[in-house]
Amino acid sequence: MARRCQLTNKKRNNAFAISHSHRRTKRLQEVNLQWKRIWWEEGKRFVRLRLSTKALKTLKAKGIGAMAREAGIDLNQF
């Protein structure tokens, strides 16, 4: 499974590690992904998703149903 948020599709970012002498080497900035069981009110059950912590914060404001509709995800598959 790819290291990608299932709601926001966030993935890792290419960046530079810059030393004191300003030499730059490529590195990857990984997404902070967590497995979470979230109560889905419309389905009356828990849904287990792999989410970024940014998506968890947005989830509290919008709700799981609205975020899934925006992402085009059918929560019955999870």
Swiss-Prot record:
A GO MF label: structural constituent of ribosome
Keywords in alphabetical order: Ribonucleoprotein, Ribosomal protein
Keyword DNA damage among record annotations: no
A single GO BP: translation
GO cellular component, one term: ribosome
Stretch forming the signal peptide: none
A Pfam family reported for this protein in Swiss-Prot or TrEMBL: Ribosomal_L28
PANTHER family the record matches: 39S RIBOSOMAL PROTEIN L28, MITOCHONDRIAL (PTHR13528), LARGE RIBOSOMAL SUBUNIT PROTEIN BL28M (PTHR13528:SF2)
Family per record: Belongs to the bacterial ribosomal protein bL28 family.
The protein's name in its UniProt record: Large ribosomal subunit protein bL28
Gene: rpmB
